[in-house]
């Protein structure tokens, strides 16, 4: 017999002798210990099964089967008859983008006068928005970008992220987006939230402190994450239901939230100096121009199995053809050559002699998404 087997046999034999020679009270204690051990084993098995089930659920990919982005010229705001109407037109774009889960809104300069230096000035905060959008400038692009960014941002972050500026003067009159990532003060059903890094010193070995719109502040787990104050972040809270001084967790991304929960986590805004830059990005599987000469949106050929990324390009008041023709240095001269496909919204002629960009965006998004959802259901 192997020495280990002898040892095991001896231990078991000693336990038996002790049990048989024990009193009635001692035997009852042994029985309680045995029942307690059995109960703990059962609890352990149940807990492991629940954790395995939870992990399986979390691994399900809820990413949508397709992604839609749009490109619009900022100059369409020049037609607004007042500052209030200008803000309202931008708000219509934001509402349409949120309703139909647009991933990105690209704002391009239809006149091709915008420079990279002007775009950099907008992003580094030196642009103030003091000029009124007009045909002689490209301020409409910056106005549109600022209003779209403001509306997409959760209300509790706006005070820290958006200083008082002329483009936002009438933003309070707009209908709220009420997007799925615009969580309320007392809403604790979701472990993900948007936050902003505060100008506060954290303890050694711990990360920055953030405002996430709850009654307590949020602390990032790791001090390896170095973020400047007033940086917007998406966070995952690890101790949401616990009684603690601060919420704690890690930084994540909107794409991760969508993949794990299926929720729409807002759109991003990007400025481009011209339509040519938009088309040269090669970021999308299908680039569709919106034109009255195109085919119906329901006839657009799409392979839904590849989770396509689709860009819908809208023109200004003169249409997408005028935007293409204004690109003097481009290798194409016609809209048919610039885009993979041209689409329109209806087989009938419009009842109105003019098309407004904000109305066109809403109708095209509705029809394209309906077409893609139909293909996905097949």
From Swiss-Prot:
Family note: Belongs to the class IV-like SAM-binding methyltransferase superfamily.
Name of this protein: Putative methyltransferase spot-1
An example Gene Ontology molecular-function term: methyltransferase activity
EC number(s) recorded for this UniProt protein: 2.1.1.-
Residues passing through the membrane, by range: none
Organism this protein belongs to: Caenorhabditis elegans
Pfam families: Methyltrn_RNA_3 (PF02598)
Keywords per UniProt: Centromere, Chromosome, Cytoplasm, Cytoskeleton, Kinetochore, Methyltransferase, Transferase
A biological-process GO annotation: methylation
InterPro entries tied to this protein: Alpha/beta_knot_MTases, NA-bd_OB-fold, Put_MeTrfase-C9orf114-like, tRNA_m1G_MTases_N
Compartments where found: Cytoplasm, Cytoskeleton, Spindle; Chromosome, Centromere, Kinetochore; Cytoplasm, Cytoskeleton, Microtubule organizing center, Centrosome
GO CC terms of this entry: centrosome; cytoplasm; kinetochore; spindle
PANTHER family the UniProt entry points to: CLASS IV SAM-BINDING METHYLTRANSFERASE-RELATED, METHYLTRANSFERASE C9ORF114-RELATED
UniProt keyword Cytoplasm present: yes
Coiled coil location: none
Chief site of localization: cytoplasm
Domain of life (superkingdom): Eukaryota
Function as written in the Swiss-Prot or TrEMBL entry: Required for association of the centrosomes with the poles of the bipolar mitotic spindle during metaphase.
């Amino acid at each position: 017999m192997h020495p280990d087997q002898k040892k095991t046999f001896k231990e078991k034999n000693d336990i038996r002798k002790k049990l048989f020679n024990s009193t009635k009270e001692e035997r009852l204690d042994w029985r309680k210990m045995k029942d307690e051990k059995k109960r703990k084993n059962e609890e352990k098995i149940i807990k492991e099964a629940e954790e395995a089930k939870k992990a399986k659920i979390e691994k399900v990919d809820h990413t949508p089967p397709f992604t839609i982005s749009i490109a619009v010229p900022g100059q369409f705001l020049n037609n607004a008859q007042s500052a209030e109407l200008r803000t309202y037109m931008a708000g219509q774009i934001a509402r349409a983008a949120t309703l139909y889960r647009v991933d990105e809104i690209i704002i391009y300069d239809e006149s091709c006068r915008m420079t990279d230096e002007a775009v950099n000035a907008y992003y580094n905060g030196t642009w103030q928005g003091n000029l009124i959008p007009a045909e002689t400038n490209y301020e409409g692009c910056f106005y549109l970008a600022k209003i779209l960014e403001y509306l997409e941002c959760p209300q509790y972050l706006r005070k820290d992220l958006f200083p008082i500026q002329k483009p936002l003067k009438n933003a309070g009159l707009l209908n709220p987006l009420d997007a799925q990532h615009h969580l309320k003060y007392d809403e604790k059903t979701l472990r993900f939230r948007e936050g902003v890094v505060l100008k506060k010193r954290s303890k050694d070995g711990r990360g920055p402190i953030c405002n996430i719109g709850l009654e307590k502040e949020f602390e990032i787990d790791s001090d390896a994450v170095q973020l400047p104050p007033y940086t917007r972040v998406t966070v995952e809270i690890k101790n949401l239901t616990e009684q603690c001084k601060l919420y704690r967790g890690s930084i994540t991304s909107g794409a991760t939230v969508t993949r794990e929960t299926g929720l729409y986590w807002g759109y991003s805004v990007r400025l481009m100096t011209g339509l040519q830059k938009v088309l040269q990005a090669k970021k999308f599987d299908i680039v569709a121009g919106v034109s009255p000469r195109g085919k119906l949106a329901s006839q657009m050929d799409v392979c839904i199995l590849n989770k396509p990324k689709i860009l819908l390009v809208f023109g200004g008041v003169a249409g997408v053809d005028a935007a293409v023709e204004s690109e003097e240095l481009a290798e194409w001269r016609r809209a048919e050559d610039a885009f993979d496909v041209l689409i329109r919204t209806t087989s009938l002629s419009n009842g109105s002699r003019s098309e407004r960009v904000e109305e066109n965006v809403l109708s095209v998004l509705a029809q394209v998404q309906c077409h893609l959802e139909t293909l996905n259901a097949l």
